[in-house]
Amino acid sequence: MFTVFLLVVLATTVGSFTLDRASDGRDAAANDKASDLIALTARRDPCCYHPTCNMSNPQICG
């Protein structure tokens, strides 16, 4: 009975470790998208933060 218990614990640990490693790839992809969005926001023209300038220059601010 103790052997069965050890096998269950081992299987659970291995399964958990494998699933955690798989989620690391998804987390990395999400982090890349977030950093791209931050970089895009940081590159915006300062004019875009002023409502008057923003409305006068839609080609710059989108």
Curated annotation (Swiss-Prot):
The cysteine framework is I (CC-C-C). Alpha4/7 pattern. Keywords: Acetylcholine receptor inhibiting toxin, Amidation, Disulfide bond, Hydroxylation, Ion channel impairing toxin, Neurotoxin, Postsynaptic neurotoxin, Secreted, Signal, Toxin. GO terms for biological process: venom-mediated perturbation of G protein-coupled receptor signaling in another organism. PROSITE patterns: ALPHA_CONOTOXIN. The modification Cysteine amide is found at residue 61. Disulfide bonds join 47-53, 48-61. One of its GO terms (molecular function) is acetylcholine receptor inhibitor activity. Belongs to the conotoxin A superfamily. It is found in: Secreted. The keyword Ligase does not apply. GO terms for cellular component: extracellular region; host cell postsynaptic membrane. Alpha-conotoxins act on postsynaptic membranes, they bind to the nicotinic acetylcholine receptors (nAChR) and thus inhibit them. Probable competitive antagonist of fish muscle acetylcholine receptor. Inhibits postsynaptic nicotinic acetylcholine receptors (nAChRs) from zebrafish (IC(50)=58-100 nM). Blocks mammalian nAChR composed of alpha-1/gamma and alpha-1/delta subunits. Blocks central nervous system nAChR composed of alpha-4-beta-2/CHRNA4-CHRNB2 subunits and peripheral nervous system nAChR composed of alpha-3-beta-4/CHRNA3-CHRNB4 subunits. Expressed by the venom duct. The modification 4-hydroxyproline is found at residue 46. Residues 1-16 form the signal peptide. Residues 17-43 form a propeptide. It comes from the Eukaryota. Coiled coil: none annotated. It comes from Conus ermineus. Residues 49-51 are annotated as: Lacks the Ser-Xaa-Pro motif that is crucial for potent interaction with nAChR. This is Alpha-conotoxin EI.
